[in-house]
Amino acid sequence: MNPVEKLALLRAEMKKRHLDAYVVVTDDFHASEYVGAHFKAREFLSGFTGSAGTLVVLPDAAALWTDGRYFLQASQQLEGSGIELMRMGQPGVPEIPALLRDHVPENGWIGFDSRTISNDFARSIGEKTREKHIRFAGDEDLVDLVWANRPALSCEPVWELDVKYAGLTRREKLAMVRGKMKEMGASVFVIPSLDEVAWLLNLRGNDVLFTPVFLSYLLLEQDTATLCVQREAVSAEIEAHLKSDGVTLAPYDDIYRLVAALPTGTRVLLDGERANYRILQSVPESAEVLDRTSPIQLM
């Protein structure tokens, strides 16, 4: 299929759900700089292979935003696709929230996979479209419905980094981060960033090109830690080592259920630039969100 045919299929799914726009970003669920083949939804739909870009699909139009590194490449690869190239930073080029405000009707719906949209990006769209009472539908990955033979999520084996290379043991690092949590008044720290999880637990993987990390989230409390990961990626030996350091395993997608089950009064630390929108939406109203730069970034 070419991009025109793929967009037609996507629009058919949008129409079934009464969506007035659908946003497809380049990110995975963890705001990683590089993404695996499973997450190349924007590339699949548009044919544009650059590493940065966001596609917005409307019922009768589509546009792709990218930066100056890719203006020439994008103009060539989008030719004949029906997708307008939006050259970011150039005069007269609207930002994505402004275009959505101008093209989505009053009380309309904007769809996206909320696991791939950052909280900050969703907030910027919400602020720009609030006056028109535009709503979000983020529970479905519509690209998955039109992408036959989509590559599966990467699930390469996780391995342990020896402390002589890591510098500190897993227990020492966990104690350091828990100390920072206390200073910040947080009872729970949701860690979605793959590099931070890998550093904190002295684990490595091969799920992302050019980066020795593995698909995972960590829910850290003062007395417990839950690693949400594809279980088949973790050997029984590594699971036992983690358990001895107070880290238990849960299925990869359980992060949303675990966050939603946090008790009343929980103070949840997370980094809004790195946490996806679905995580933020999962936090109970009875809990308090502390949107701060991750303390791990400062270690």
Give, region by region, the residue ranges found by the protein language model:
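Terminal domain-start leader segments
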Residues: 1-299
